[in-house]
Amino acid sequence: MKKYLNLTALLLVGISNVTWANAVNELQNRLNKIDVLSADYTQQVTDAQGKKIQQGSGKIQLKRPNLFRMDNETPQESQIIADGKTLWFYDPFVEQVTANWVEDTLSDTPFVLLTSNNPSHWQQYIVEQKSDTFIIKPKSKKSTIKQFNIRIEKDGVLKNFSTIENDGQSNLYILRKITNPALNDAIFTFTLPKGVEFDDQRKK
C-alpha cells in the first residue's frame, strides 16, 4: 500500500510540474509579443476586506528585454525604473532614492517578470493559468508579496496586473491608451537628482 501511495504522490508532483511549465510557457509566449509598450494606468488599492482605500494613476513603459518604468502621478509622485541590472525607486516627497540589484528584489518586485525571459527569474515563482489570467506566487517565504496576477490576452494585449500583499492589501493596475511606440533605452536610465538621500542597497 505504501508503494502505491508513494507512486501516487510522485505522479501528482509530476503533473503539477507539467502544469507549472505549461503555464510559464504560455505566459512567456504572450509576453514575448510585447516588444515595447507605453500606457496610462489607473491604480485601485483595496484592503483585505475588499474596501477601496486609495486610487491613483500614472504611466508605464516596457521594453524587452528587462527594461521597465512606472511613473506614478497621483495621489503622490513616485518612480520605479529597472534598467536590466538595477531597480531604482524614487520618492520625491521624501526626497529619497533606493537602488537594489534586480536579482535581489525578484520575490518582492514581480513587475520585472513582464519583460524577463531569464529562466532563473521564473524559477523563483509558481505560475498557474486561469483563462487569460496568470497567478504568480513567489516560492520565497520571506517575500512581502503573496501573489502577482497578470491578465493578458492570447494576442499579447496586456489588460491589467495586480499584487496582493501578505496582509491582504491589493494593488490593481488597469491599463488604457496602450501604444507600441519606439522607445529609446535612455528612458530606462535613472539619473540621481541633486540633494536627495541615496540608499544604495547594492553595496550591502
Swiss-Prot record:
GO terms for cellular component: outer membrane-bounded periplasmic space. Monomer. Participates in the translocation of lipoproteins from the inner membrane to the outer membrane. Only forms a complex with a lipoprotein if the residue after the N-terminal Cys is not an aspartate (The Asp acts as a targeting signal to indicate that the lipoprotein should stay in the inner membrane). This is Outer-membrane lipoprotein carrier protein. Belongs to the LolA family. Residues 1-21 form the signal peptide. Keywords: Chaperone, Periplasm, Protein transport, Signal, Transport. The gene is lolA. It is found in: Periplasm. It comes from Histophilus somni (strain 129Pt). InterPro entries: LolA/LolB/LppX (IPR029046), OM_lipoprot_carrier_LolA-like (IPR004564), OM_lipoprot_carrier_LolA_Pbac (IPR018323). GO terms for biological process: lipoprotein localization to outer membrane; lipoprotein transport.
